[in-house]
């Protein structure tokens, strides 16, 4: 699948390029050129790691399905203590989706535990070896989740900025 810039629809890149670059050269965001149709009923039968891999595979078509399955299984199995996407029964047919089972107890762990693996693989897919610096500005739990996710990732450093006051 190709991704295009929100500021130049003629600028198209692969998913690896979009992930490795972050923002387009003209400052736009990369968005998918289409939204794949998925069989929701089939997804309901999957555990969270398999569901995540199945959905992501539709968008990151230049990544191997085996890599995506392993990355999702490792991320949402270990870091989430087996409770990723846990639906806690409330009453009758009512459930609550618990999003705090990640390593920093922030819902942002869902993205920020997987994204470092995707970035490293994107750079590998593209033959890029330069160091990547991730800059994060936040006033909340995004910083801790990002720091935890990118901790000890080879070829990647991260700096988090918090406002004062």
Briefly describe each language-model feature range.
Residues 1-165:
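PLP-dependent amino-acid enzyme catalytic core
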